[in-house]
């Protein structure tokens, strides 16, 4: 009986093996365009016959298809012969965000950042702050952040549904980078969150109010990171990777901020009407950002602007019962005719406890001192300890 044919790679001489490798490589190179994605660590491909076709990752199904197509061309090979080339350093590598920024057309000189910001709000501080935030986002995509991470997150707020907040956040991403947008960040693992900072371009903290207060220190720490020490999935070794992702957020609640000193990491803006998310000219918007970064425009917030943002966030603070009792009994500003009382935290605590003991449940004088500091009550240090300047109502 006839002996069944076997692939050429089975039990062959070194010369035949080299010949097969050459035939397989030539077939792949003449039919497909390949590239290695440094972010996802995947090889991507598209047919050479249609360069407009988008690249897509090679999985097991695609690998088997390539092997079958080689068989149809008379090349008797195994899938390992195909994968040997596909997963080799002969495939050129690229970084999706660097490539996007490198291939942008020249900026035409028309400011598109201001109209884009005004789609959300015409508040001057917002227009200015959104522009700086977008510069920070673009700087991280270009890998130019240095010591300045994009450590602020705009939070789009509206009590009513249907204002297109989440849609606007997603529409900031160019189409070719949409896969690097996410809106379901889980703050359960710091290592996992750090890995996402090195792989995503924009992370939407959608429904920002769902994140527990206990998670805020972790989130703020992530937002300040400019470089990352990451161990990727299925790997044992940690690597230092640049941060790519910036943060943005949405909420239907206005009582979001609980810590005025930490609120400089967020920029709350009220969305008063549905946001127009159509016709965003991504190429020219990012070309403008690229040109401004090249001209040395600052992509971080200075102390003065951070202070303005904290003042802007004041209406979005969430007050605890202890703060409410304090404000019902004392003021922190005095008129010309009035004099400040100089009271210790213990003195104020005792007086408030007489007024409303339930509101101070769980507090002691030391804990209450932290509340006064958080509220920004002016403090003076004396030889007898700290006193707070207040006016009794």
Question: Which ranges hold each PLM region?
Answer:
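DNA transaction DNA-binding modules
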Residues: 300-393
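AAA+/SF3 P-loop NTPase mechanochemical coupling elements
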Residues: 193-198, 232-250
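P-loop NTPase catalytic core of nucleic-acid-dependent motor ATPases
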Residues: 86-198
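Conserved AAA+/SF3 P-loop NTPase catalytic/coupling segment centered on the Walker-B
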Residues: 200-223, 257-262
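N-terminal nucleic-acid engagement/recognition segments and initiation subdomains in replication
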Residues: 1-110, 121-128, 354, 358-359, ...
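A short helix-turn-beta junction within AAA+ P-loop NTPase domains corresponding to the substrate/partner-engaging
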Residues: 257-276
């Amino acid at each position: 009986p006839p002996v069944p044919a076997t692939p050429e790679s089975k039990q062959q001489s070194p010369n035949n093996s080299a010949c097969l490798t050459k035939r397989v490589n030539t077939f792949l190179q003449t039919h497909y365009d390949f590239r290695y994605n440094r972010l996802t660590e995947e090889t991507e491909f598209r047919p050479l016959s249609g360069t407009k076709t988008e690249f897509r990752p090679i999985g097991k199904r695609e690998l088997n298809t390539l092997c079958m197509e080689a068989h149809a061309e008379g090349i008797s090979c195994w899938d390992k012969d195909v994968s040997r080339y596909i997963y080799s350093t002969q495939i050129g590598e690229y970084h999706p965000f660097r490539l996007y920024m490198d291939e942008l057309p020249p900026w035409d000189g028309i400011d598109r950042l201001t109209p884009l910001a005004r789609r959300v709000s015409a508040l001057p501080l917002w227009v200015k702050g959104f522009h700086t935030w977008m510069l920070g986002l673009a700087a991280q995509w270009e890998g130019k952040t240095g010591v300045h991470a994009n450590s602020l997150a705009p939070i789009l707020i509206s009590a009513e549904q249907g204002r297109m907040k989440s849609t606007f956040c997603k529409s900031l991403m160019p189409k070719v980078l949409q896969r690097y947008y996410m809106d379901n960040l889980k703050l359960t693992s710091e290592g996992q969150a750090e890995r996402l900072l090195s792989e995503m371009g924009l992370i939407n903290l959608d429904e920002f109010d769902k994140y527990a207060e206990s998670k805020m220190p972790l989130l703020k720490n992530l937002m300040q990171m400019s470089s990352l020490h990451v161990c990727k999935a299925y790997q044992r070794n940690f690597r230092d990777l640049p941060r790519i992702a910036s943060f943005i957020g949405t909420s239907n609640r206005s009582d979001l901020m609980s810590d005025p000193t930490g609120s400089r990491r967020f920029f709350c803006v009220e969305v008063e009407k549905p946001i127009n998310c159509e016709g965003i000219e991504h190429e020219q918007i990012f070309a403008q950002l690229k040109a401004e970064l090249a001209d040395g425009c600052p992509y971080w917030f200075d102390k003065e602007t951070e202070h303005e943002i904290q003042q802007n966030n004041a209406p979005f603070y969430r007050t605890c019962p202890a703060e409410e009792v304090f404000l019902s009994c004392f003021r922190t500003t005095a008129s010309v005719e009035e004099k400040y009382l100089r009271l210790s935290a213990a003195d104020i605590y005792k007086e408030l406890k007489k007024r409303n003991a339930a509101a101070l449940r769980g507090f002691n004088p030391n804990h209450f001192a932290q509340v006064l500091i958080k509220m920004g009550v002016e403090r003076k240090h004396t030889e007898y300890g700290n006193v707070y300047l207040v006016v009794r109502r």
